[in-house]
């Protein structure tokens, strides 16, 4: 949802799906039938970046460059990904990489061509322990990293007694933003809709605030 908020603010944004073999960012964006080329087509010169990156049909400025379904991961090198990122940054204001789950080759390829990292976690011990491991793996790349705490509710804070400050301490990261728990999010995902275009509160408001901070604006951190 962050990429949607950035695009809505007038930025030219590319979503790069790097989950090779398990891509699903096209589903989240409602662009299943739109993405015909993937980033390996650009890497190996089969088409241009302008042709492979598809603009969202309902939100101007939001583009998707998807991952391949079947491909030899060993053929995708760090040098090739860094060259691709140079192309991307010449044409877009932001490139948000959807990093694959786990700490494997896809994770390290994504880290090698990024200039910062955003860790999105829920406010529970298991997720925060995973975040600690990710932070350790990111250190060799020298990437500045920040934390987004997702699905936060006042009820959870009261019952579990674990608040956002606790999450920051456990992950060892500064806070970029807080996203409230919002029942509209799974409904919008199932329908392939852009929640941020429907409302300006709840999770959409949380991500809009994060987008403004990424653009250098000072926005208070809080949730409703």
Go through each PLM region and give its residues.
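Short, small-residue-biased leader/transition segments that mark boundaries at the very start
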Residues: 1-2
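Alpha-helical scaffold segments in soluble metabolic enzymes
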Residues: 5, 41, 52, 83, ...
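Post-Walker A helix-loop "phosphate-sensing" segment adjacent to the P-loop in P-loop NTPases
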Residues: 5-15
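P-loop/Walker-type NTP enzyme "switch/lid" segment
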Residues: 15-90, 187-196
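Residue-level signature of catalytic and energy-coupling elements of molecular machines
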Residues: 17, 25, 42, 98, ...
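Amphipathic alpha-helical transducer elements in NTP-driven molecular machines
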Residues: 36, 50, 78, 82, ...
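Conserved catalytic-core segment of NTP-binding enzymes
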Residues: 83, 87-90, 94-181, 186-187
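NTP-binding/hydrolysis catalytic cores, primarily Walker-type P-loop NTPases
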Residues: 190-224
């Amino acid at each position: 949802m962050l990429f949607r908020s950035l695009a809505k603010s007038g930025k030219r944004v590319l979503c790069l799906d790097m989950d090779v073999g398990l891509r699903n960012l096209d589903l989240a964006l409602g662009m299943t039938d739109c993405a015909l080329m993937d980033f390996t087509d650009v890497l190996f010169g089969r088409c241009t970046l302008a042709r492979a990156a598809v603009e969202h049909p309902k939100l101007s400025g939001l583009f998707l460059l998807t991952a391949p379904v079947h491909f030899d991961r060993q053929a995708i090198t760090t040098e090739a990904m860094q060259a691709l990122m140079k192309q991307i940054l010449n044409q877009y204001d932001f490139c948000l990489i959807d990093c694959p789950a786990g700490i494997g080759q896809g994770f390290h390829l994504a880290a090698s061509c990024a200039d910062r990292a955003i860790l999105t976690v829920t406010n529970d011990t298991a997720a925060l322990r995973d975040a600690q491991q990710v932070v350790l793996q990111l250190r060799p790349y020298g990437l500045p990293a920040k934390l987004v705490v997702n699905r936060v509710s006042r009820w959870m804070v009261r019952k579990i007694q674990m608040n956002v400050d606790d999450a920051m301490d456990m992950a060892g990261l500064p806070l970029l933003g807080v996203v409230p728990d919002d029942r509209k999010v799974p409904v919008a995902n199932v329908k392939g809709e852009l929640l941020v275009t429907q409302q300006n509160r709840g999770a959409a408001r949380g991500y809009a605030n994060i987008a403004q901070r990424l653009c250098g604006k000072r926005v208070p951190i809080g949730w409703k």
